[in-house]
Amino acid sequence: MGQKIHPTGFRLGITQDHWSRWFADTDRYPELLQEDFKVRNYVNKNLSNAGIAGVRIERKADQIDLEVRTARPGVVVGRGGSGIESLRVGLQKELGDDRPIRINVVEVARVDAEATLIAEYIVQQLVRRVSFRRVVRQAIQRAQRAGVEGIKIQVGGRLNGAEIARSEWTREGRVPLHTLRANIDYSYRTASTTYGILGVKVWVFKGEVIPGADEQPTNREPQQRRRQQQRRRQQFEDRSE
């Protein structure tokens, strides 16, 4: 089951939290849900060069609180806060009212350990027609330098322009999808290339969350685990040259 279900939805309330935190009456729920969809689309579209890792939405009465997690907070804030003000005005026009919107910008501590940013990086390289094997290898190396416990990347579609679509994946370290206490960061993105659509999936294992304690990486039986990783490891060969 852990291999098929969405890793984030599988762990809601355990290691993952909801990206939208508000309550509403039954009649207003669809309207507010569509507003959340519009807000996230607007932020991701207009701040595509800021490395947006996620947008958390909270509602208090008629006020909307946004928490924008980004790799480049200076791009979002702008000079003298002009970026935030223009973003607020644009969101009010998108929603069609003048409700107060409070925006809090949070910098991502480890950029190369965020599944969303890793997937965005791979998509950008695939659109530039870089070999997918080379891109995946570079992304894994950057994630390992960032200190992740494990990472798995899958790319599917007409890889390198092949006539028959296929999917290939590689994994480094542990990615325990069946373990509920495992903090798994997951993201899915699509790349529009001249040969068609390529799907990119990224799983990042950041350690196990022990109840009543901070997030801790598991270091039990390192030698045995290393031997298992060597047996299960699958390397991409770069045949683009």
Swiss-Prot record:
Coiled coil: none
Pfam families in the cross-refs: KH_2 (PF07650), Ribosomal_S3_C (PF00189)
Keyword vocabulary terms for this entry: Ribonucleoprotein, Ribosomal protein, RNA-binding, rRNA-binding
Family annotation (SMART domains): KH (SM00322)
Gene Ontology terms: biological process: translation
Listed GO CC annotations: cytosolic small ribosomal subunit
Region annotated Disordered, chain positions: 213-241
GO terms, molecular function: mRNA binding; rRNA binding; structural constituent of ribosome
Free-text function comment from the UniProt entry: Binds the lower part of the 30S subunit head. Binds mRNA in the 70S ribosome, positioning it for translation.
Binding partners and assembly: Part of the 30S ribosomal subunit. Forms a tight complex with proteins S10 and S14.
Protein name stated in the entry: Small ribosomal subunit protein uS3
